[in-house]
Amino acid sequence: MSIVNRSAYVPYSAEYVYSLVNDIKNYPCFINGCSSANILEDLDTHMIASIGIKKAGVAFKFTTKNLLEFPSSIEMHLVEGPFKYLTGCWKFDGLSQNACKVNLTIDYEFNNKILGAITSKIFDQIANTLIDDICARADTLFMKVE
């Protein structure tokens, strides 16, 4: 079992950061280690998406159903993949029009203990930098608008 819990205060609205996190189809453009992203179902209340991970010679794919509560949270539940279980939650707490606190919690365990020992380190690295990658994407897109 592994748990990732990260948070950050960012100089952007909760709505803006929520939209970037929910922009899964573009993850390969800005999430380190994400090799593919496919949206399988996209509704107002939820999204089902498949993500490919490829880093340091390790590659795997997983699918989650994401429950959407704009602009406050995105809750992730495993549909399929190499995990025994995987759940996660993004929370966006608006502090002002131009600031919010972002929190990401991911709880998971890989099916295969031996493969999991290697893969878990890579998944931890990616999960631990997700907020940084989202913030960098926000900075890049915000500067293009200014």
Range-by-range predicted roles:
Residues 6-8, 62-67, 87-94:
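Hydrophobic/aromatic beta-strand elements that line small-molecule binding cavities or substrate pockets
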Residues 17-21, 27, 49, 66, ...:
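Hydrophobic pocket/interface hotspot
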Residues 136-146:
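Short, highly charged C-terminal tails/helix-capping segments
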Residues 1-44:
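Hydrophobic ligand-binding cavity/cleft-lining segments
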Residues 38-79, 133, 137:
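Glycine-rich portal/gate segments that line the openings of hydrophobic small-molecule binding cavities
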Residues 78-129:
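Beta-strand/loop substructures that line and gate deep hydrophobic ligand-binding cavities in soluble
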Residues 2, 43-45, 58-60, 84, ...:
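Residue-level preference for beta-strand/loop junctions
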